């Protein structure tokens, strides 16, 4: 049986030395590198938090259906989202390649409302044809699943146009919030320098004014919160 009176701390001399040796050896073999990745950020504590410190709260919420205009066309696609305030960071709209509703749109561009950024319509098997409208907005800077899709296509913006690339180093997510979860300079007026929930309210009001909000419907959501701050 296990003797619980005996234990080792990962920063003990022996353990620490072994970890450093392993990392150095892996680095020499080009098996390990230091890079960027999306993290859980607590705007109250102003620190990244472990996945183990994130708790999910189930609640009733809303799903908003938003019209995204197609470039050089009178048509649009409708994107369903629970977080319309993040649309300023959108870098693509993805559809399932087997979805007959959108096959003719793959490769075309969306002109993102309020921003004017041109974002591509991509085909990806990740998209669930049965959820929402079957059109998924891709916001790599603010969603873990979107981050993986953005990395897969190396999405990056060049002069107001989001492009894809075969080079992983080209991938550059667009971050729209600062450490306090207020909108930053990547968000245009009158939506910048606002708390994220005030951004949501302002976005929805403007979408209604421009007749870009198709509808809203009740939707059960799972909200991640920091275990220590409940934010």
Residue ranges and their predicted role:
Residues 2-3, 7-180, 186:
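NTP-handling and nucleic-acid-processing catalytic cores
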Residues 30-34, 195, 214-218:
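Short, surface-exposed helix-loop/turn micro-motifs enriched in polar/charged residues
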Residues 42-43, 224-227:
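Cys/His/Pro-rich metal-binding microdomains
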Residues 104-107, 184-200:
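A glycine-biased structural micro-motif
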Residues 198-223:
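Phosphate/diphosphate-binding loops
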Residues 230:
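Detector for conserved single-position "signature" residues within domains
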């Amino acid at each position: 049986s296990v003797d619980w009176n005996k234990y080792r701390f990962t920063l003990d001399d022996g353990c620490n030395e072994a970890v450093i040796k392993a990392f150095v050896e892996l680095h020499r073999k080009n098996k390990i590198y230091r890079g960027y990745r999306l993290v859980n950020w607590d705007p109250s504590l102003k620190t990244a938090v472990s996945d183990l410190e994130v708790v999910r709260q189930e609640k009733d919420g809303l799903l908003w259906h938003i019209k995204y205009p197609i470039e050089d066309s009178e048509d649009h696609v409708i994107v369903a989202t629970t977080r319309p305030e993040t649309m300023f960071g959108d870098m693509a709209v993805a559809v399932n390649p087997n979805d007959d509703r959108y096959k003719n749109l793959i490769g075309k561009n969306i002109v993102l409302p309020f921003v004017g950024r041109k974002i591509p319509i991509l085909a990806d098997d990740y998209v669930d044809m049965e959820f929402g409208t079957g059109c998924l907005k891709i916001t790599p800077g603010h969603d873990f699943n979107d981050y993986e899709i953005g990395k897969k296509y190396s999405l990056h913006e060049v002069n107001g146009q989001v492009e894809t690339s075969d080079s992983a180093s080209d991938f550059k997510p667009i971050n729209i919030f600062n450490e306090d979860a207020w909108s930053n300079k990547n968000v245009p007026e009158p939506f910048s320098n606002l708390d994220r929930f005030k951004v949501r309210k302002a976005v929805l009001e403007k979408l209604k004014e421009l007749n870009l909000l198709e509808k809203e419907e009740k939707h059960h959501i799972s909200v991640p919160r920091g275990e220590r701050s409940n934010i």
